């Protein structure tokens, strides 16, 4: 790890290393003290443009006044209402809001993305009385054992851990097609192989509860599939009596311009998982479905903190803010601006930037060697150079940098952040 920015940061990092479990991955020693909007300030007073939004969590911006006020007002009444045992208004209001935004009329609350996926897995297995799943190479759905079975982005996530039965298919990664085909002439063979290969040779659809898929692969590299990919997955689910589960944990809450990213592809899943931006900084996850599917009896599934009153109040305020401020339209507008600037940089640095892809403010920049192969080392150096220059960048996939700033980022902040990103590229290109 590089040297922390200042003395307070250095001291806190040292204490952290002495006490916190070493399993966490930190790309650089940023020690945050406060943040507002799209600006983070560290413990030594240095400010950074946040292009990561706490891993796509702070869509409404850090320290959003309306969210803060809602949390404070609820805290003065009660923090935890034991929603798994009793009743309360805040989580019910939140569920009603989610129904209005999505059309799903049943909601299960939990605390995180991985828990929302676990609930989706259990619901699909319970409803269809089947125990197997189909996932995708490059997917990330969490690190608890059920969701980890679906996760297939890095082997270090899975080594030594038992898993439930999941067969993985190829995702629609057209820039590096694993089947060495060309879109659109490929006929979406990656998705078709679920039916033509997996369901014929390895896993009967009669034993399959669900196909679980991200609208855009997140940790796998911010990979945007062609529209027909999800449409083909939907067809396969329909024709084989299998549920389609959409993991909207990272892509949801207007990040791609629509409340649910699957809307961009004209597809509606049977079960939806949400978290991250849903809680506006507080731990909150939700699993959504229809009343026809989510009809499991009391005691089938539960958790102590699901429907937490503070998280529910924060989420409702955040959703109301997103809707009123039309953050979906803003994400599309600023996303177009980011994509234009980043593609200009790609044309100037073709030996470093291989691909720019995204929807709304969920954008991936794939870093390559001059021969076009992945270059994770240079990717990591760019991320660190960005930190030194005052921007927060996050890696994903094998060789990609993600751009997922708060949806409230100003154009001036966006320009500053992109200028600093270009400076990082320039520094490394001069070294080469």
Region locations from a protein language model:
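Conserved N-terminal phosphate-binding loop of PLP-dependent enzymes in the Aspartate aminotransferase
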Residues: 1-432
């Amino acid at each position: 790890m590089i040297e922390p920015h200042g003395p307070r940061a250095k001291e806190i990092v040292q204490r952290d290393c002495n006490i916190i479990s070493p399993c966490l991955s930190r790309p650089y020693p940023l020690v945050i003290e406060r943040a507002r909007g799209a600006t983070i300030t560290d413990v030594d007073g240095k400010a950074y443009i946040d292009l990561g939004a706490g891993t796509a969590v702070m869509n409404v911006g850090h320290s959003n006044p309306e969210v803060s006020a809602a949390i404070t007002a609820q805290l003065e009444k009660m923090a935890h209402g034991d929603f798994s045992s009793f009743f309360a208004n805040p989580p019910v209001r939140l569920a009603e809001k989610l129904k209005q935004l999505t059309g799903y009329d049943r909601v299960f609350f939990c605390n995180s993305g991985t828990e929302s996926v676990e609930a989706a897995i259990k619901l699909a297995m319970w409803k269809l009385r089947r125990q197997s799943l189909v996932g995708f190479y490059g997917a990330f759905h969490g690190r608890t054992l059920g969701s980890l079975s679906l996760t297939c982005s890095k082997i270090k996530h899975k080594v030594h851990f038992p898993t439930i039965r999941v067969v993985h298919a190829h995702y629609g990664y057209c820039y590096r097609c694993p089947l060495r085909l060309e879109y659109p002439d490929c006929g979406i063979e990656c998705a078709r192989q679920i039916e033509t290969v997996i369901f014929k040779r390895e896993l009967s659809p009669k034993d399959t509860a669900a196909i679980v898929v991200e609208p855009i692969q997140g940790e796998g590299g911010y990979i945007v599939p062609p529209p027909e990919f999800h449409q083909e997955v939907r067809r396969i689910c329909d024709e084989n009596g299998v549920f389609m589960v959409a993991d909207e944990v990272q892509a949801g809450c207007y990040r791609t311009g629509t409340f649910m990213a699957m809307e961009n592809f004209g597809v509606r899943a049977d079960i939806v998982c949400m978290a991250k931006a849903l809680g506006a900084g507080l731990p909150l996850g939700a699993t959504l479905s229809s009343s026809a599917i989510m009809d499991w009896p009391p005691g089938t599934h539960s958790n102590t903190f699901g429907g937490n009153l503070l998280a529910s109040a924060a989420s409702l305020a955040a959703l109301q803010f997103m809707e009123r401020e039309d953050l979906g339209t803003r994400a599309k507008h600023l996303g177009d601006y980011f994509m234009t600037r980043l593609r200009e940089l790609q044309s100037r640095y073709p030996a470093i930037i291989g691909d720019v892809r995204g929807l709304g403010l969920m954008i991936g920049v794939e870093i390559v060697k001059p021969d076009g192969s992945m270059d994770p080392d240079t990717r990591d150096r760019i991320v660190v150079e960005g930190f030194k220059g005052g921007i927060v960048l996050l890696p994903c996939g094998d060789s990609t940098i993600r751009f997922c700033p708060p949806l409230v980022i100003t154009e001036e902040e966006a320009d500053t952040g992109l200028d600093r990103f270009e400076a990082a590229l320039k520094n490394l290109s001069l070294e080469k």
